[in-house]
């Protein structure tokens, strides 16, 4: 006897089952239900299993766990090209052209806002950054030099500016090359903050923010890990200084033409109408020139005339005269004739703040707020446009072109080709920050994967050094060697980092670390801001402050912290790969208090502290809020608290049940006491978790 006797003749036939027009199912056999009695006399109802009901019981569908790092499928929700008439096709073409033009316009203003943002940071903190270079005793400490490079680049938002200051100091013999190399390493770290700030603008959607923040911080982790390995190696061996000195001495470089300006030819006409800076003041402050301490960095006169003329001047004694024939005495004064150089102002600059008598800090604050607003607006609009354009076949082609590897056995070549593409694109835009910041929204919406963004970012690091090398070759003969050696140190530092963290897949730690940080930041979005403040401000400032006190104090404070970090890393590795070698208590982090091993208590604390700033709005305000959100297309999570609560109230999770459950036998069974499942308008079964299981 079969374990399921009802299934022996369970083939569906047209004679046994009919479906009426009104959707009810009726069984033709006379005894679909048989009532029996047990020993106690209680009636038992036997229900004959319908085939669709029985298959649901016997077949288990495998559940697939969704990988959050898989690229989303960008489906085309509009009409297909074949379904459009002639008028619709023409409108579609013009609409595509219009979107492409708008995309270029928003991208142009996005790049210009980055340039203005850099100028704003220089006005606000440029003089403070220049003073970091005054203390030569601190600069001799490699660790302090590295954090000075980070702080200066964060404050001026330009690694080119901080590098040019270092080159000027090396050329003036105020700073040796071996002390300048850690500053270059720190500048490489500081320049990666820009695209991390850009990634914060996509915090509205958790999935997009996970990808965007991971794609941005992969640059951070590469630079930090490279410095962690190469800075002690350079301090112990000086290999970068020796290698670059050998290259410079072996090849007889001559002064060349200035580095070509490609993107700046387009952006400078607009940004120079907003603000123009005299960046030579930063170099003079770094060289401890007291005459420019109170001088404004805002350029007032763009056209000047330098004239050399002979004038009668007084000198202390006849020995100071230019020649005996040009020396005479008039009473108590000795006079002579000397060549005097004076500068005559001819034409003022044409920018907004040229006639405003405002301090650098006020102008910098105004530009900082304005440029951040423009940056956020342009980024949001770029993401919306890309989201509407990159759909269907277009998205599939672009994603396949960017993320697909070459066929075996040449698949390994794809990553190195991506490095070359990243270097070439960065050479064109002449800024690694611009290239990586423009790539961040593409990572967020799922066009570029993290695995492909990593080599593109490494190429951007190489591309920005080639621009510096060309700029160094355009230097005058007195500074050619020093500036070229610094630029080559930057180049070989990035090459060494690529050798460490790219060729072998196992060593691509920046990808895994960035994914981990992306998972944490998408769940606790405030942690992204904490990461920026801690790694780019607090840690460098703490190291710099301890360096001011002295090297022994820095070692005494840092050693226990480094030891604890190493113990945590080793314990985490042992827990993951060989937990059997650990005591039972150390196989997990449960022995620690909950607030030390989880961010959930901190999240509750921060949520409670910030709840007073969340907007509570009335019914009328909710209508306005939803109208504004509908116009700008922003995500639901950026709406006010009351609107979000209204949207989440009574929200039932739609679970697509297997087809076997979506049958009329279940409805028949529901009439006998089982809760009937509700079906929404789209045909999706809205069921509870118990019913689905």
UniProtKB/Swiss-Prot annotation:
- Where are the membrane-spanning stretches? 90-110, 136-156, 213-233, 362-382, 409-429, 486-506, 526-546, 551-571
Q: How is it modified after translation?
A: Glycosylated.
Which residues lie toward the Extracellular compartment?
111-135, 234-361, 430-485, 547-550
Q: Which residues are glycosylated?
A: 307, 320
Those parts of the protein on the Cytoplasmic side are 1-89, 157-212, 383-408, 507-525, 572-693
Q: Give the Gene Ontology MF terms in alphabetical order.
A: phosphate ion binding; sodium ion binding; sodium:phosphate symporter activity
**Where would you find this protein in the cell?**
Apical cell membrane
Q: What family does this chain come from, according to its entry?
A: Belongs to the SLC34A transporter family.
- Recorded protein name is Sodium-dependent phosphate transport protein 2B
């Amino acid at each position: 006897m079969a374990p399921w006797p009802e299934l022996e003749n369970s083939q569906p036939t047209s004679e046994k089952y009919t479906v009426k027009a009104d959707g009810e199912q009726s069984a033709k056999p006379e005894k679909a239900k048989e009532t029996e009695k047990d020993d106690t006399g209680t009636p038992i109802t036997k229900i004959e299993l319908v085939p669709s009901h029985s298959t649901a019981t016997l077949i288990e569908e495998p559940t697939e766990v969704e990988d959050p790092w898989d690229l989303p499928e960008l489906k085309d929700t509009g009409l297909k090209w074949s379904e459009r008439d002639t008028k619709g096709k023409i409108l579609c073409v013009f609409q595509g052209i219009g979107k492409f033009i708008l995309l270029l316009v928003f991208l142009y203003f996005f790049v210009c806002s980055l340039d203005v943002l850099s100028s704003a940071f220089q006005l606000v903190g440029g003089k403070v950054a220049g003073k970091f270079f005054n203390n030569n005793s601190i600069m001799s400490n490699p660790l302090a030099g590295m954090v000075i490079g980070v702080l200066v680049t964060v404050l001026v938002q330009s690694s080119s500016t901080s590098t040019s200051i270092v080159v000027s100091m090396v050329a003036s013999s105020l700073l040796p090359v071996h002390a300048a190399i850690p500053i270059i390493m720190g500048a490489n770290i500081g320049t990666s903050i820009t695209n991390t700030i850009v990634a914060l603008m996509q915090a509205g959607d958790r999935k997009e923010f996970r990808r965007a923040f991971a794609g941005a911080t992969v640059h951070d982790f590469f630079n930090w890990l490279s410095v962690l390995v190469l800075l002690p190696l350079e301090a112990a061996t000086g290999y970068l200084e020796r290698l670059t000195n050998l290259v410079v001495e072996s090849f007889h470089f001559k002064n060349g033409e200035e580095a070509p300006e490609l993107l700046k030819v387009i952006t400078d006409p607009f940004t120079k109408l907003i603000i123009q800076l005299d960046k030579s003041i930063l170099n003079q402050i770094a060289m401890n020139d007291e005459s420019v301490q109170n001088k404004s960095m805002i350029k007032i006169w763009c056209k000047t005339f330098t004239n050399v003329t002979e004038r009668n001047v007084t000198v202390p004694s006849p020995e100071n005269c230019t020649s005996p024939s040009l020396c005479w005495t008039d009473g108590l004064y000795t006079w002579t004739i000397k060549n005097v150089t004076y500068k005559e102002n001819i034409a003022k600059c044409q920018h907004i703040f040229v006639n405003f008598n405002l301090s650098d800090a006020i102008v910098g604050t105004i530009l900082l707020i304005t440029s951040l607003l423009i940056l956020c607006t342009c980024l949001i609009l770029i993401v919306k446009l890309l989201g509407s354009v990159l759909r269907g076949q277009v998205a599939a082609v672009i994603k396949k072109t960017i993320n697909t590897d070459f066929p075996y056995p040449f698949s390994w070549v794809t990553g190195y080709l991506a490095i070359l593409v990243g270097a070439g694109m960065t050479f064109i835009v002449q800024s690694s920050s611009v290239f990586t910041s423009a790539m961040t929204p593409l990572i967020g919406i799922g066009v570029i994967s993290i695995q492909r963004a990593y080599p593109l970012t490494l190429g951007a690091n190489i591309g920005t050094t080639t621009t510096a090398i060309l700029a160094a070759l355009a230097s005058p003969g007195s500074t050619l060697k020093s500036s070229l050696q610094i630029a080559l140190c930057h180049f070989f530092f990035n090459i060494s980092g690529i050798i460490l963290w790219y060729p072998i897949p196992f060593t691509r730690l920046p990808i895994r670390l960035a994914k981990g940080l992306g998972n944490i930041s998408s769940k606790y979005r405030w942690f992204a801001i904490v990461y920026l403040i801690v790694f780019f401000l607090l840690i460098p400032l703490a190291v710099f402050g301890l360096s001011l006190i002295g090297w022994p104090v820095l070692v005494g404070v840092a050693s226990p912290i480094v030891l604890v970090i190493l113990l945590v890393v080793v314990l985490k590795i042992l827990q993951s790969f060989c937990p059997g070698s650990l005591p039972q208590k150390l196989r997990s982090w449960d022995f620690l208090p909950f607030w030390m091993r989880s961010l959930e208590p901190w999240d509750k604390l921060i949520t409670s502290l910030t709840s007073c700033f969340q907007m509570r709005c009335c019914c009328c305000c909710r209508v306005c809020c939803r109208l504004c959100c509908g116009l700008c297309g922003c995500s639901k999570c950026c709406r006010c608290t009351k609107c979000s609560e209204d949207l989440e109230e009574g929200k039932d999770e739609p679970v697509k049940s297997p087809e076997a459950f979506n049958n009329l036998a279940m409805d028949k069974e529901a009439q006998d006491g089982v809760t009937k499942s509700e079906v929404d308008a789209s045909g999706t079964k809205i069921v509870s978790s118990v019913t689905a299981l």
